[in-house]
């Protein structure tokens, strides 16, 4: 934790629950085999045994204690190099103006197959141990094991996950086939917003009882293609050269030179410098760079590491989220994808098509250059958020999931839709890339339309009439808003709807009761209305 007189920020890595630690801890790790057999994980040790930034939390302020990641043994679910798995669960937050509970907190969790490897590294002399693991055959014909590179917990875990005492390294390995992993965590505070996962077919429950939030997430690991390329300036395609020239003139562009580098370095020709681009997976730049490098990389991924992780989206990623999602309390949804690049934030809502849209991107082939890479997408949406977006009820049984390529042509995909315990779940699998858009739509039977009304073109249907037509209970303390799906016929203006031209004006009215002690999480209700404009 970092502190000052004005407050502090903290990043707490949680350990296992014990008799003394009953909250802000990992309750358990479970593996489920393909035949349905459940294998309970057993806590083995912290790794390292003690971290350099461990700290004792503050129960009165809801700040958990922070320690190292933990190793768990799944004896009945071994991977290729043993049965140890590293579990990392992080809660990140801050104290502002004397309050550590109100500021939004982020949540991260991951499971990684590992084996402990004893290296010859001595931090007293090396400073940092080297962590790129490789096997080489020497001139004498014998195999030697070496490490190179800077020790860092980065690059999607391809290098050592982390380091322990006396030069021990936790090497990452592939997940075993056919094993689903479930992680159960207890928290003193509830995460909020939207979760993003690198996993397949997640099933989640988030319950708060007696001031303890229990998160249980079960999912299969997924393989995410890594896209990387390098080349001398002269051999790079013209489009890539032009991109570097435009973006890196008088700009650092990711080399070891400091950001504030001046003089000859920045005026040096782009062609004479080492330049690195490493855009975020959810950035517009990532989509642009994938398109630029596709031909040079022969449309082939450089690696296919398997992952199992989930995180809350940051504030910057949530800026464009639909109001129904941003105003929701607690975790409002989960999206999971195996694409190299994906849309920033939650899926965007298109009022014209009444669909939640999400764009992804990847190269067409796996590392072997032959096997087509098949996309996977999961969307889990809390029922009250779905109600707010679509104006549907929990009993809705009609949904569509479609995948459309950049050319507007539908792509073949296996899709599914279920509803269980307050959550709608959608999935699309088996589609190809490069940058398709996945659209999810919930619809209600026609008898869900509450009321039809005749209105005149050029008039405004005010709030009072819309509330009456909706048939919803409304108090002056309630929040309300209206969403139009036919903007060419009518549009929202002020607190009403302006009828622009003849046709059918379709809209949804939403009402959310005020938060109270008796109703701490009020449910948003909605009703669909059709105005016949003449």
Q: What is the predicted function of each stretch?
A:
Residues 376-390, 423-430, 469, 493-498:
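Exposed aromatic-hydrophobic patches
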Residues 338-400:
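Proteolytic processing hotspots in large secreted/extracellular or virion-associated proteins
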Residues 1-333:
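Long, leucine/valine-rich, helix-dominated scaffolding and oligomerization segments
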Residues 393-398, 406-409, 473-479:
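Short proline/glycine-enriched turn/loop motifs at strand-loop junctions of beta-rich domains
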Residues 424-446:
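C-terminal beta-strand-rich structural cap/linker in extracellular carbohydrate-active enzymes
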Residues 409-422:
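Solvent-exposed serine/threonine-rich low-complexity stretches and specific carbohydrate-binding patches
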Residues 447-534:
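Extracytoplasmic soluble-region selector
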């Amino acid at each position: 934790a970092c502190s000052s007189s004005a407050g502090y920020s903290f990043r707490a890595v949680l350990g296992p629950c014990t008799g003394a630690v009953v909250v802000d801890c990992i309750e358990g790790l479970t593996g489920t085999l393909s035949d349905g057999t459940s294998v309970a994980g057993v806590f083995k040790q912290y790794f390292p045994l003690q971290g350099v930034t461990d700290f004792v939390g503050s129960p009165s302020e809801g700040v958990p204690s922070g320690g190292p990641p933990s190793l768990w043994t799944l004896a009945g679910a071994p991977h290729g190099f043993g049965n140890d798995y590293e579990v990392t669960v992080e809660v990140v937050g801050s104290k502002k103006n004397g309050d550590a509970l109100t500021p939004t907190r982020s949540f991260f969790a991951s499971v990684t197959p590992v084996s402990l490897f004893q290296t010859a590294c001595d931090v007293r002399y090396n400073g940092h141990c080297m962590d790129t693991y490789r096997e080489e055959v020497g001139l004498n014909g014998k195999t030697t094991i070496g490490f190179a590179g800077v020790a860092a917990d980065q690059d999607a875990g391809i290098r050592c996950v982390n380091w322990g005492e006396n030069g021990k390294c936790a090497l990452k390995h592939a997940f075993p086939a056919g094993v689903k992993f479930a992680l159960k965590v207890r928290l003193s505070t509830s995460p909020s917003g939207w979760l993003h996962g690198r996993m397949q077919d997640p099933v989640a429950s988030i319950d708060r009882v007696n001031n303890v939030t229990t998160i249980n997430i079960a999912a299969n690991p997924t393989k995410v293609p890594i896209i990387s390329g390098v080349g001398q300036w002269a051999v790079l395609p013209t489009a890539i050269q032009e991109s570097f020239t435009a973006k890196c003139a008088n700009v650092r562009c990711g080399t070891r030179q400091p950001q504030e580098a001046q003089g000859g370095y920045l005026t040096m020709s782009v062609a004479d410098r080492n330049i690195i681009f490493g855009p975020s997976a959810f950035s517009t730049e990532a989509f642009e760079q994938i398109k630029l490098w596709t031909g040079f990389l022969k449309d082939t991924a450089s690696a296919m590491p398997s992952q199992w992780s989930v995180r809350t989206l940051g504030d910057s990623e949530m800026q464009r989220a639909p109001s129904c999602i941003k105003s929701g309390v607690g975790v409002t949804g989960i999206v999971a994808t195996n694409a190299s690049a994906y849309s920033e934030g939650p899926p965007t809502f298109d009022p014209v098509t009444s669909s939640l849209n999400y764009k992804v991107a990847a190269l067409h082939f796996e590392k072997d250059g032959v096997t087509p890479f098949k996309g996977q997408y999961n969307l889990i949406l809390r029922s009250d958020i779905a109600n707010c977006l679509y104006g549907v009820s929990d009993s809705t049984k009609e949904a569509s999931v479609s995948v459309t390529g950049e050319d507007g042509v539908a792509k073949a995909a296996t899709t599914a839709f279920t509803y269980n315990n307050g959550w709608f779940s959608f999935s699309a699998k088996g589609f190809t890339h490069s940058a398709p858009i996945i659209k999810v739509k919930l619809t209600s039977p026609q008898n869900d339309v509450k009321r039809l009304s005749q209105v005149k073109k050029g008039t405004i249907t005010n709030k009072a009439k819309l509330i009456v037509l909706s048939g919803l209970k409304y108090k002056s303390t309630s929040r309300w808003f209206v969403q139009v799906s036919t903007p060419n016929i009518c549009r929202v203006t002020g607190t009403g709807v302006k009828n622009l031209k003849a046709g059918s004006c379709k809209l949804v009215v939403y009402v959310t009761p005020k938060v109270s002690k008796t109703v701490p999480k009020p449910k948003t209700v909605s009703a669909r209305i059709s105005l016949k404009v003449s």
